[in-house]
Amino acid sequence: MQQLGIHSVPQEIRQFIGVILLSGYNCQPEAKHYWSTQPDIGAQGAISCMSHNRFMEIKNYLHLADNQKLVEGDKMSKVTPLYKLLNSSFVKHGMFHEKLSVDESIVPYFGRHAAKMFLKCKPIQFGYKVWILCGNDGYPYHMIIYQRKEIHAPKVPLSTRVIRSMVDVIQETSNTTRHALYFDNFFNSYDLLVMLSELKMRAIGTIRPYRSKGADAVMLPDKDLMKQKRGAFEFCSDGNIPEKPAYVHI
Protein backbone atom coordinates (compact mmCIF):
# COMPACT_ATOMS: atom_id res chain seq x y z
CA MET A 1 0.00 0.00 0.00
CA GLN A 2 1.51 3.32 -1.05
CA GLN A 3 -0.34 6.61 -0.92
CA LEU A 4 0.76 10.09 0.13
CA GLY A 5 4.11 8.71 1.26
CA ILE A 6 2.59 5.86 3.29
CA HIS A 7 4.26 2.57 2.47
CA SER A 8 3.46 -0.83 3.91
CA VAL A 9 3.90 -4.52 3.16
CA PRO A 10 1.47 -7.48 3.44
CA GLN A 11 3.04 -8.71 6.68
CA GLU A 12 2.48 -5.35 8.36
CA ILE A 13 -1.15 -5.25 7.19
CA ARG A 14 -1.68 -8.71 8.69
CA GLN A 15 -0.23 -7.44 11.96
CA PHE A 16 -2.53 -4.41 11.78
CA ILE A 17 -5.56 -6.69 11.34
CA GLY A 18 -4.29 -8.82 14.22
CA VAL A 19 -4.31 -5.80 16.53
CA ILE A 20 -7.89 -5.06 15.47
CA LEU A 21 -8.90 -8.65 16.23
CA LEU A 22 -7.16 -8.37 19.59
CA SER A 23 -9.24 -5.30 20.41
CA GLY A 24 -12.39 -7.36 19.83
CA TYR A 25 -11.93 -9.37 23.02
CA ASN A 26 -9.42 -7.26 24.95
CA CYS A 27 -11.47 -4.09 25.19
CA GLN A 28 -9.92 -0.77 26.17
CA PRO A 29 -11.49 2.73 26.31
CA GLU A 30 -8.97 4.07 23.78
CA ALA A 31 -6.64 2.50 21.23
CA LYS A 32 -3.56 4.06 22.82
CA HIS A 33 -4.10 1.99 25.96
CA TYR A 34 -2.93 -1.15 24.13
CA TRP A 35 0.53 0.42 24.03
CA SER A 36 0.48 1.52 27.67
CA THR A 37 3.58 0.84 29.76
CA GLN A 38 1.34 -0.10 32.69
CA PRO A 39 1.54 -3.91 33.05
CA ASP A 40 -2.16 -4.26 33.86
CA ILE A 41 -3.29 -2.22 30.82
CA GLY A 42 -0.90 -2.65 27.90
CA ALA A 43 -1.30 -5.56 25.47
CA GLN A 44 1.96 -7.26 24.60
CA GLY A 45 0.45 -8.58 21.37
CA ALA A 46 -0.07 -5.05 20.07
CA ILE A 47 3.22 -3.71 21.43
CA SER A 48 5.23 -6.45 19.71
CA CYS A 49 3.54 -5.84 16.33
CA MET A 50 3.97 -2.11 15.79
CA SER A 51 4.02 1.24 17.52
CA HIS A 52 0.86 3.15 18.36
CA ASN A 53 1.80 5.93 15.93
CA ARG A 54 2.28 3.43 13.10
CA PHE A 55 -1.04 1.75 13.87
CA MET A 56 -2.88 5.08 13.72
CA GLU A 57 -1.05 6.05 10.54
CA ILE A 58 -2.17 2.91 8.73
CA LYS A 59 -5.68 3.29 10.12
CA ASN A 60 -5.96 6.85 8.81
CA TYR A 61 -4.85 6.00 5.28
CA LEU A 62 -6.23 2.50 4.77
CA HIS A 63 -8.86 2.27 1.99
CA LEU A 64 -10.83 -0.86 1.13
CA ALA A 65 -12.34 0.37 -2.15
CA ASP A 66 -11.42 2.62 -5.05
CA ASN A 67 -13.27 5.91 -4.58
CA GLN A 68 -13.50 6.27 -8.36
CA LYS A 69 -15.44 3.01 -8.66
CA LEU A 70 -17.95 3.22 -5.82
CA VAL A 71 -21.36 1.71 -6.57
CA GLU A 72 -24.07 4.36 -6.70
CA GLY A 73 -26.79 3.76 -4.11
CA ASP A 74 -24.62 1.45 -2.00
CA LYS A 75 -24.19 3.31 1.29
CA MET A 76 -21.56 0.82 2.44
CA SER A 77 -19.62 0.75 -0.83
CA LYS A 78 -16.35 1.76 0.87
CA VAL A 79 -16.36 -1.48 2.88
CA THR A 80 -18.34 -3.70 0.48
CA PRO A 81 -15.20 -5.43 -0.90
CA LEU A 82 -14.18 -6.40 2.63
CA TYR A 83 -17.47 -7.91 3.77
CA LYS A 84 -17.90 -9.71 0.43
CA LEU A 85 -14.49 -11.26 1.02
CA LEU A 86 -15.51 -12.20 4.56
CA ASN A 87 -18.76 -13.80 3.35
CA SER A 88 -16.80 -15.82 0.82
CA SER A 89 -14.34 -16.96 3.50
CA PHE A 90 -17.10 -17.92 5.96
CA VAL A 91 -18.43 -20.64 3.63
CA LYS A 92 -15.09 -21.66 2.16
CA HIS A 93 -15.37 -25.10 3.73
CA GLY A 94 -19.13 -25.45 3.39
CA MET A 95 -21.95 -25.18 5.89
CA PHE A 96 -21.34 -27.74 8.63
CA HIS A 97 -24.07 -26.87 11.16
CA GLU A 98 -27.52 -28.41 10.99
CA LYS A 99 -29.13 -25.77 13.21
CA LEU A 100 -28.83 -22.23 11.88
CA SER A 101 -29.95 -18.94 13.39
CA VAL A 102 -30.75 -15.62 11.72
CA ASP A 103 -30.64 -12.53 13.90
CA GLU A 104 -29.33 -8.99 14.05
CA SER A 105 -26.03 -7.74 15.41
CA ILE A 106 -24.96 -4.16 16.02
CA VAL A 107 -21.57 -2.68 15.17
CA PRO A 108 -21.09 0.32 17.51
CA TYR A 109 -20.58 3.63 15.71
CA PHE A 110 -21.18 7.18 16.93
CA GLY A 111 -20.11 9.18 13.89
CA ARG A 112 -22.25 10.40 11.03
CA HIS A 113 -23.30 7.96 8.33
CA ALA A 114 -26.44 7.38 6.27
CA ALA A 115 -26.67 3.75 7.40
CA LYS A 116 -26.21 4.41 11.12
CA MET A 117 -29.14 3.30 13.26
CA PHE A 118 -30.56 4.34 16.62
CA LEU A 119 -32.03 1.35 18.44
CA LYS A 120 -33.88 2.26 21.58
CA CYS A 121 -33.79 -0.17 24.52
CA LYS A 122 -30.79 -2.04 23.08
CA PRO A 123 -27.45 -2.54 24.86
CA ILE A 124 -25.77 -0.85 21.88
CA GLN A 125 -28.03 1.97 20.72
CA PHE A 126 -25.97 3.59 17.96
CA GLY A 127 -24.29 1.80 15.09
CA TYR A 128 -24.71 -0.35 12.01
CA LYS A 129 -27.26 -3.15 11.99
CA VAL A 130 -26.02 -6.39 10.47
CA TRP A 131 -28.16 -9.44 9.70
CA ILE A 132 -26.14 -12.59 10.39
CA LEU A 133 -26.65 -16.27 9.59
CA CYS A 134 -24.90 -18.32 12.28
CA GLY A 135 -24.47 -21.88 13.42
CA ASN A 136 -25.76 -22.89 16.85
CA ASP A 137 -22.30 -22.22 18.35
CA GLY A 138 -22.15 -18.68 16.94
CA TYR A 139 -20.01 -19.37 13.86
CA PRO A 140 -21.04 -16.85 11.15
CA TYR A 141 -21.81 -18.01 7.61
CA HIS A 142 -23.17 -14.86 6.01
CA MET A 143 -23.83 -11.24 6.90
CA ILE A 144 -25.86 -8.47 5.32
CA ILE A 145 -25.29 -4.88 6.39
CA TYR A 146 -28.64 -3.12 6.67
CA GLN A 147 -28.61 0.17 4.76
CA ARG A 148 -31.95 1.50 6.00
CA LYS A 149 -34.91 2.03 3.68
CA GLU A 150 -34.26 1.28 0.02
CA ILE A 151 -35.67 3.66 -2.59
CA HIS A 152 -36.66 0.90 -5.01
CA ALA A 153 -37.28 -1.86 -2.48
CA PRO A 154 -39.67 -4.64 -3.57
CA LYS A 155 -43.04 -4.97 -1.87
CA VAL A 156 -41.90 -8.11 -0.06
CA PRO A 157 -41.42 -7.36 3.68
CA LEU A 158 -37.86 -6.68 4.80
CA SER A 159 -37.91 -9.62 7.20
CA THR A 160 -38.86 -12.02 4.40
CA ARG A 161 -36.21 -10.61 2.07
CA VAL A 162 -33.52 -11.15 4.70
CA ILE A 163 -34.54 -14.76 5.34
CA ARG A 164 -34.82 -15.48 1.61
CA SER A 165 -31.31 -14.11 1.05
CA MET A 166 -29.97 -16.36 3.79
CA VAL A 167 -31.79 -19.38 2.36
CA ASP A 168 -30.20 -18.67 -1.03
CA VAL A 169 -26.79 -18.78 0.64
CA ILE A 170 -27.65 -22.08 2.33
CA GLN A 171 -28.78 -23.64 -0.93
CA GLU A 172 -25.69 -22.43 -2.78
CA THR A 173 -23.14 -23.61 -0.22
CA SER A 174 -24.65 -26.72 1.38
CA ASN A 175 -25.18 -30.18 -0.07
CA THR A 176 -27.73 -31.22 2.55
CA THR A 177 -31.37 -30.32 3.18
CA ARG A 178 -31.18 -31.19 6.89
CA HIS A 179 -30.74 -27.59 8.02
CA ALA A 180 -33.25 -25.98 10.37
CA LEU A 181 -33.63 -22.21 10.65
CA TYR A 182 -34.32 -20.44 13.95
CA PHE A 183 -35.40 -16.80 14.17
CA ASP A 184 -37.41 -14.42 16.35
CA ASN A 185 -40.74 -12.68 15.84
CA PHE A 186 -39.24 -9.85 13.79
CA PHE A 187 -38.85 -12.30 10.91
CA ASN A 188 -41.49 -14.94 11.50
CA SER A 189 -44.88 -15.02 9.81
CA TYR A 190 -47.27 -17.62 8.45
CA ASP A 191 -46.43 -16.68 4.85
CA LEU A 192 -42.70 -17.01 5.54
CA LEU A 193 -43.15 -20.50 7.01
CA VAL A 194 -45.18 -21.52 3.97
CA MET A 195 -42.42 -20.24 1.68
CA LEU A 196 -39.74 -22.12 3.64
CA SER A 197 -41.84 -25.28 3.61
CA GLU A 198 -42.06 -25.07 -0.18
CA LEU A 199 -38.26 -24.75 -0.27
CA LYS A 200 -37.95 -27.89 1.91
CA MET A 201 -36.45 -25.83 4.72
CA ARG A 202 -37.38 -26.52 8.34
CA ALA A 203 -37.92 -23.49 10.58
CA ILE A 204 -38.99 -22.54 14.07
CA GLY A 205 -39.45 -19.19 15.79
CA THR A 206 -41.60 -16.95 17.92
CA ILE A 207 -44.35 -15.07 16.11
CA ARG A 208 -46.39 -11.93 16.56
CA PRO A 209 -50.14 -12.63 16.87
CA TYR A 210 -51.15 -10.47 13.91
CA ARG A 211 -48.86 -12.49 11.62
CA SER A 212 -50.35 -15.87 12.53
CA LYS A 213 -53.20 -15.83 9.99
CA GLY A 214 -55.85 -16.05 12.72
CA ALA A 215 -54.21 -18.73 14.87
CA ASP A 216 -54.20 -16.35 17.83
CA ALA A 217 -57.99 -16.04 17.63
CA VAL A 218 -58.58 -19.74 18.37
CA MET A 219 -55.99 -20.04 21.14
CA LEU A 220 -55.98 -18.87 24.74
CA PRO A 221 -54.84 -15.27 25.27
CA ASP A 222 -51.43 -14.85 26.89
CA LYS A 223 -52.92 -13.61 30.15
CA ASP A 224 -55.06 -16.76 30.49
CA LEU A 225 -52.30 -19.16 29.53
CA MET A 226 -50.00 -17.59 32.12
CA LYS A 227 -52.47 -18.70 34.80
CA GLN A 228 -51.99 -22.34 33.83
CA LYS A 229 -49.43 -24.65 35.42
CA ARG A 230 -45.82 -24.40 34.38
CA GLY A 231 -45.24 -26.15 31.06
CA ALA A 232 -48.82 -25.70 29.84
CA PHE A 233 -49.18 -25.15 26.10
CA GLU A 234 -51.66 -25.02 23.26
CA PHE A 235 -51.22 -25.78 19.60
CA CYS A 236 -53.12 -25.49 16.36
CA SER A 237 -52.32 -26.54 12.82
CA ASP A 238 -53.51 -25.71 9.33
CA GLY A 239 -53.25 -29.40 8.46
CA ASN A 240 -50.48 -28.90 5.91
CA ILE A 241 -47.53 -29.66 8.17
CA PRO A 242 -47.40 -33.42 8.82
CA GLU A 243 -44.50 -33.57 11.28
CA LYS A 244 -45.19 -30.88 13.89
CA PRO A 245 -47.98 -28.50 14.89
CA ALA A 246 -47.93 -25.20 13.05
CA TYR A 247 -48.21 -23.07 16.19
CA VAL A 248 -47.36 -23.88 19.78
CA HIS A 249 -48.46 -21.48 22.51
CA ILE A 250 -46.47 -21.86 25.76
Regions found by a protein language model. Give the residues of each.
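Acidic, contiguous segments within the catalytic cores of piggyBac-derived transposases
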Residues: 1-250
